[in-house]
Amino acid sequence: KAAEVIAAGKVFACDVGLFDEDVFVYIAAFGIFTEVSYGTPQEMKNMLGHMAYILEGVKHLQNIKSYQMKVTYKTIENNGFGETEECEKVVEDDFIFGMITNSLSVGGFKSLTGNVMGKNVVLNDGLFEVTLVKMPKNPVELNSILVALMSEKVDTEFMYCLKSSELLIESQEEVAWTLDGEYGGKHTCVKLKNKQKAIDILVPTA
């Protein structure tokens, strides 16, 4: 299959993400499930796919930690005159999980990145899909969050779902990050920027 792509594939210019000075291809994330991505045994990932993330993540639910964060991000909005323009917005809240993605799926879940029936995610549009999960106030809210994640319906009152080309994320304490499933260090301030069509990859023609 790989040989066929090399011989007859087409070039696709894909976005990549900058995380300060580091580069990531499909996801930068923090919070409750991020340790799962680099802490789950590879054998379990291979055998169970996205269920491995759920099974491993459940272990962390008894010790949910939230992070007070300020997220400043650039987005595109309609200016009311039939035109779009870039503007800057700020979100401040307590978050238990967040991910900045340029991917059609994460851990086997297609809608977690905003990809509803493959319509909402474009891999070379210069925009990240951003999901920020708020700290639940009680077990009922926690259950609602888990149901939303399991059913891949993430645009709820317990989450912020947005698109952005550039973000500045600040916190009072160090937060551990994962970049493409690998440990990305602890940070109190990170800048993420989408580099549009930064790399060329070969993809099948069909």
How should these model regions be labeled?
Residues 1-97:
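Catalytic core of DAGKc-family lipid kinases
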Residues 19, 73, 100, 169-171, ...:
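Hydrophobic residues in beta-strands and at strand termini
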Residues 19-21, 28-30, 101-103, 135, ...:
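Fold-independent oxyanion-binding glycine-rich loops
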Residues 29, 33, 99-115, 183:
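Glycine-rich phosphate/pyrophosphate-binding beta-alpha loops
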Residues 34-36, 79-82, 105-110, 138-142:
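Short acidic/glycine-rich loop or secondary-structure boundary segments that cap or lie
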Residues 44-52, 103-136:
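Gly/Ser/Thr-rich active-site loops/lids in small-molecule metabolic enzymes
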Residues 117-125, 132-206:
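ATP/nucleoside-binding phosphotransfer catalytic cores, i.e., glycine-rich phosphate-binding loops
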